[in-house]
């Protein structure tokens, strides 16, 4: 099988107060920067000194986004999109935009939509004073919700050459969705909780406890790969190998055999002390993120661990390759950007702080082909950031945590949350197109 892989792809609260509080002094006193704020320990409110190095940027307030029609189309049935957000940016450009810690203050955080609307029971309707919207961004619109799963969605895939979208859930089912009608076209009952799902070419891979299920969407061939112990939390493909991240901390590898038209065991990568929850392949390297708070770097040629990254202080939930950089997010409320040194080892070149634990990363170009990072947080939102500046592009809201994000063709992307609901989104060129 000739497989090519796109680069995919705690608990201290962080406060960002910009400028003096209302009622604070506005003369020479307010022209000074608070030394305690600089040290990260100012507890005065209001504080008479500046809590900012630069004047606050004017925040552009995005318009509402709601449900559009109930049909989306897959104009390129070959899938595409990948989980990596292409582009370039030197290490000195990280975080240099509005919202980035190095280049100026964050955008003003937008008001949240009506919580009763999100729960589906707002009695005020159009008279409600709070936005009835699943997003706060003028760059995206929600096309349709897809309902049917009864528990958290843990994987979404769009196989090449298929007109079906696939989703997996802890309810033990795989659902097939017709890309032309938005209707559920079939349900496969796996009988076990689904831990993850990916597609590569015509292949669909589904991680379940103690096994990986494999389907060829073109030939309808079905296989069952055994060897994992416990749940399979992540899958990745690279260098003609299939990798599965398991609950016991191992990463198992299989190689496709043209002779048997199947997958043969190739290796077991050992090193993590706790469950591995995310995998990504890029530049002949496999990157694995674990509950043991580390990221390991594996050489795809030798399948040996060549570096262990230990800068995170919480569970590392997701890793993503973007251009020549590695991005990681953690429950320690940070997104870290890693770059290679002259010796070839990775080190942190930028840390972006969040106010909540980060769960999942994905990347894609927007409607104007600018790279955007999508980061799911455990406050039931997804943050959108321009890369490499980390400028704020808005937020997506959900009833429960969004655990699955999948990029599609033509500006489409999909999210799956803890209630079992999927949503289909699309980037738009003009904010006036958002509904």
From Swiss-Prot:
Top-level taxonomic group: Eukaryota
Alphabetical list of SUPFAM superfamilies matching this protein: CCCH zinc finger, WD40 repeat-like
Keyword field contains Repeat: yes
Zinc finger residue extent: C3H1-type: 28-54, 108-135
InterPro entries found in the cross-reference section: G-protein_beta_WD-40_rep (IPR020472), WD40/YVTN_repeat-like_dom_sf (IPR015943), WD40_repeat_CS (IPR019775), WD40_repeat_dom_sf (IPR036322), WD40_rpt (IPR001680), WDR86-like (IPR044715), Znf-CCCH_4 (IPR041367), Znf_CCCH (IPR000571)
Pfam assignment, any one: zf-CCCH_4
Residue ranges, annotated region (Disordered): 1-30, 58-107
Each WD repeat, start to end: 148-189, 191-225, 227-264, 271-308, 311-348, 355-395, 397-435
Disulphide bond pairs: none
Biased composition (Gly residues): 77-103
Sorted UniProt keywords: DNA-binding, Metal-binding, Repeat, WD repeat, Zinc, Zinc-finger
UniProt-recorded Gene Ontology molecular function terms: DNA binding; zinc ion binding
UniProt keyword annotation of Ligase present: no
Protein name, entry field: Zinc finger CCCH domain-containing protein 17
């Amino acid at each position: 099988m000739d497989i090519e892989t796109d680069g995919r792809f705690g608990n201290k609260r962080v406060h960002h107060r910009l400028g003096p509080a209302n009622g604070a002094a506005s003369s020479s006193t307010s022209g000074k920067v608070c030394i305690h704020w600089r040290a990260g320990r100012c507890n005065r409110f209001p504080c008479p000194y500046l809590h900012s190095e630069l004047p606050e940027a004017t925040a552009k307030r995005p318009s509402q986004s709601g449900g559009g029609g109930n049909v989306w189309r897959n104009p390129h049935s070959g899938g595409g999109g990948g989980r990596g957000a292409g582009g370039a940016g030197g290490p000195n450009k990280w975080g240099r935009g509005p919202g980035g810690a190095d280049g100026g203050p964050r955008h003003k955080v937008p008001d949240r939509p009506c919580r009763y609307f999100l729960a589906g029971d707002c009695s005020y309707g159009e008279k409600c004073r709070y936005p009835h919207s699943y997003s706060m961004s003028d760059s995206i619109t929600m096309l349709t919700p897809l309902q049917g799963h009864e528990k958290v969605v843990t994987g979404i895939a769009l196989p090449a050459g298929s007109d079906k979208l696939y989703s997996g859930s802890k309810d033990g089912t795989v659902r097939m969705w017709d890309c032309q009608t938005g209707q559920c076209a079939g349900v496969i009952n796996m009988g076990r909780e689904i831990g993850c799902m990916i597609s590569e070419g015509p292949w669909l891979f589904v991680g379940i406890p103690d096994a990986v299920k494999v389907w060829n969407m073109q030939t309808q061939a079905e296989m069952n790969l055994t060897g994992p112990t416990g749940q399979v939390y992540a899958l990745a493909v690279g260098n003609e190998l299939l990798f599965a991240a398991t609950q016991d901390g191992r990463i198992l590898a299989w190689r496709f055999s043209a002779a048997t038209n199947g997958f043969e065991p190739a290796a077991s990568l050992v090193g993590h002390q706790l469950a591995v929850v995310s995998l990504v392949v890029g530049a002949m390297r496999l990157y694995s993120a674990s509950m043991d708070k580390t990221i390991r770097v594996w050489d795809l040629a030798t399948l040996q661990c060549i570096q262990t990254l230990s800068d995170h202080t919480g569970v590392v939930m997701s890793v993503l390759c973007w251009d020549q950089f590695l991005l990681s997010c953690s429950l320690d409320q940070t997104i870290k950007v890693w770059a290679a040194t002259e010796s070839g080892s990775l080190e942190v070149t930028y840390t972006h702080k969040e106010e909540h634990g980060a769960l999942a990363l994905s990347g894609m170009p927007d409607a104007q082909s600018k790279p955007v990072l999508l980061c799911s947080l455990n406050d039931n939102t997804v943050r959108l950031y321009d890369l490499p500046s980390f400028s704020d592009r808005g937020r997506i809201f959900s009833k429960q945590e969004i655990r699955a994000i999948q990029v599609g063709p033509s500006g489409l992307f999909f999210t799956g949350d803890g209630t079992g609901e999927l949503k289909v989104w699309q980037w738009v060129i003009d904010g006036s197109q958002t509904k």
